[in-house]
């Protein structure tokens, strides 16, 4: 009986240990699932934080150190180092380049050389130019008829201003604080870029 009892006791203990070990292993899948879920949550938080920081960085690029103008209940924003006026942004280059090179630089900034629409805009640009400084604008002479044309393919309205100097099919226009002059397009001057301002309404970007 002792051997039999001893055998039964040992067998019972082994069965208990086996059940306990099996129970312990059965908890591992749940543990790993919880760990996986927690890891996914942490990764998601990092991703959302990165998106949020990127959004605010982009927003700061257009809102920090710039003027904000309100027109008809809307706000207009320009990138850093651009001037804001009547829903448009203006950038005055610091590099001397040809007319075509200046236009190419403006295009890379998602803009174009200045196109003056009215006398108010003309006055704003001339007041913004430093004394003695010249700037390329988006005005050139056509190959036919020696007519002045803007880069948006509209002809210059004589009532807006007159271009001073001789003209030919290689002429482009530069502006100063007082006048607009005809110059050879291969000459080098600083360019004036123009683009539409970013429209916002009630603090929400329109783009």
Swiss-Prot record:
Residues bearing PTM Phosphotyrosine: 7
Start and end residues of each C-type lectin domain: 85-194
Cystine pairings recorded for this chain: 78-89, 106-193, 172-185
Assembly: Homodimer; non-disulfide-linked. Interacts with CLEC2A.
Membrane topology of the entry: Single-pass type II membrane protein
SUPFAM superfamilies: C-type lectin-like (SSF56436)
PTM entry text: N-glycosylated.
Listed CDD domains: CLECT_NK_receptors_like
Keywords: Cell membrane, Disulfide bond, Glycoprotein, Lectin, Membrane, Phosphoprotein, Receptor, Signal-anchor, Transmembrane, Transmembrane helix
Extracellular side: 52-207
Glycosylation sites: 67, 202
Gene Ontology CC annotation, any one: plasma membrane
Cytoplasmic-side positions: 1-30
Locations listed in the record: Cell membrane
The name this protein goes by in its record: Killer cell lectin-like receptor subfamily F member 2
Pfam family, one: Lectin_C
GO molecular function term, any single one: protein homodimerization activity
InterPro entries hit by this protein: C-type_lectin-like, C-type_lectin-like/link_sf, C-type_Lectin_Receptor_IMM, CTDL_fold, NKR-like_CTLD
Main location: membrane
Lineage: Eukaryota, Metazoa, Chordata, Craniata, Vertebrata
Spans traversing the lipid bilayer: 31-51
Known role: C-type lectin-like receptor involved in natural killer cell mediated cytotoxicity and cytokine secretion in keratinocytes via its interaction with CLEC2A. Triggers degranulation in a SYK-dependent manner and stimulates SYK phosphotyrosinylation without recruiting SYK directly.
SMART domains: CLECT (SM00034)
Example GO BP: natural killer cell degranulation
């Amino acid at each position: 009986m002792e051997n039999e009892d001893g055998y039964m006791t040992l067998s019972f203990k082994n069965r208990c240990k086996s059940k306990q070990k099996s129970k312990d292993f059965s908890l591992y899948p749940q543990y790993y699932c919880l760990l996986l879920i927690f890891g996914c949550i942490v990764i998601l938080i990092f991703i959302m934080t990165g998106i949020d920081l990127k959004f605010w960085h982009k927003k700061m690029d257009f809102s920090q150190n710039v003027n904000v103008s309100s027109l008809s209940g809307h706000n207009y924003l320009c990138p850093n180092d651009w001037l804001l006026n009547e829903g448009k942004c203006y950038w005055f280059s610091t590099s001397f380049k040809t007319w075509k090179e200046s236009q190419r630089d403006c295009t890379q900034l998602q803009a174009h050389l200045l196109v003056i629409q009215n006398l108010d805009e003309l006055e704003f640009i001339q007041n913004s130019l430093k004394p003695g400084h010249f700037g390329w604008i988006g005005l050139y002479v056509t190959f036919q008829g020696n007519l002045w044309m803007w880069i948006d393919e509209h002809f210059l309205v004589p009532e807006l201003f007159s271009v001073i100097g001789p003209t030919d099919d290689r002429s482009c226009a530069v502006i100063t604080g007082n006048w607009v002059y005809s110059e050879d397009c291969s000459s080098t001057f600083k360019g004036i870029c123009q683009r539409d301002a970013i429209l916002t309404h009630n603090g929400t970007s329109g783009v």
